Each structure stands twice: as C-alpha cells, then as structure tokens.
C-alpha cells in the first residue's frame, strides 16, 4: 500500500465527480496533480496541488476549485480534514485509523514492507565512484561511494 498513491486516486476520483457535476470541464489532464507531504507539518498530513494545476486549463480560480473539491474529499472516511490554504492548495489531515492500519501493515510485512516491483526486470546502471587514478582521493569520493552503494542497494531491494 502506498498511502500517497491511494490518496491521489481519491483526489482524481473527486475531480471526476466535479467533471460529472459540470463543475469542471471535460478533458482535463490530471498528470501533474500531486499528493505529497506539506512543507509545514502543522498544515496536515498531505497536500495536493490539484486546484492550482487545473485552474488555468479550466478557466476557474484555483481557490474556487479547491473549495469545491474539499467537501468531496472530506466525505471519504480516511480524511479527517481538508482545508484550503493560500491561493488554492488543499491540505489534508488523515484519520487516526489510517495511521493505525499503516502500522499494522508494517508489523505484518516486517522487512518486506516498502518493497516494490516498480522497475522490476529493468536494468539500471549506477555509476557512483569516479576517482581519478592519478590524483589524490578526498572526502567527496567517499561520499559518492557511500551514496551510490546505498542507492544501488535500494534499487536492488
């Protein structure tokens, strides 16, 4: 389970409801709609840029889109709050039960939690140490080696 992916699907579904209710025009692309952690944790658990991204193509103000989107998101049992901030960002707070369920999944899956098949069976070349054989080594080479090795291990996981 990827919580951010699941909530993004919820946002896209709510946007589809707005299109069906003629609150948004048909044919809008949701490709640039994101759900991510807010810059300030006091603003909630997640934030979406949906209203900001869709404002120009829909010909509406981002704040108006966010204010119409918020109640649709609040109707989902996973969402404790959906608050419009600034020009049209939407900050989302998740119910405690969502976090409890996530902890249960972590405990159930153990070391396999977070494993993904994204990019499975694809070859990736990670080049991370490029020390000049005729020059002196320095701390930057060590940093590159450690970072590259960690990245390669994550990709292998």
Task: Label the model's feature ranges.
Residues 52, 56-57, 100-157:
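N-terminal catalytic cores of NTP/NDP-binding nucleotidyl/phosphoryl-transfer enzymes
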């Amino acid at each position: 389970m990827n919580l951010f992916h699941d909530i993004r699907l919820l946002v896209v579904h709510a946007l589809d409801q707005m299109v069906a209710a003629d609150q948004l025009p048909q044919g809008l692309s949701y490709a640039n709609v994101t759900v991510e952690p807010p810059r300030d944790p006091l603003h909630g658990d997640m934030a979406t840029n949906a209203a900001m991204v869709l404002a120009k193509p829909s010909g509406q103000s981002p704040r108006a889109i966010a204010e119409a989107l918020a109640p649709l998101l609040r109707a989902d049992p996973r969402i404790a709050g959906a608050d419009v901030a600034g020009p049209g960002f939407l900050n989302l707070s998740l119910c405690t039960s969502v976090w409890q369920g996530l902890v249960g999944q972590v405990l159930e899956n153990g070391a396999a939690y977070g494993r993904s098949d994204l990019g499975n069976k694809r070859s990736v070349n990670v080049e991370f140490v490029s020390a000049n054989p005729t020059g002196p080594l320095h701390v930057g080479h060590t940093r590159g080696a450690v970072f590259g090795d960690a990245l390669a291990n994550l990709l292998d996981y």
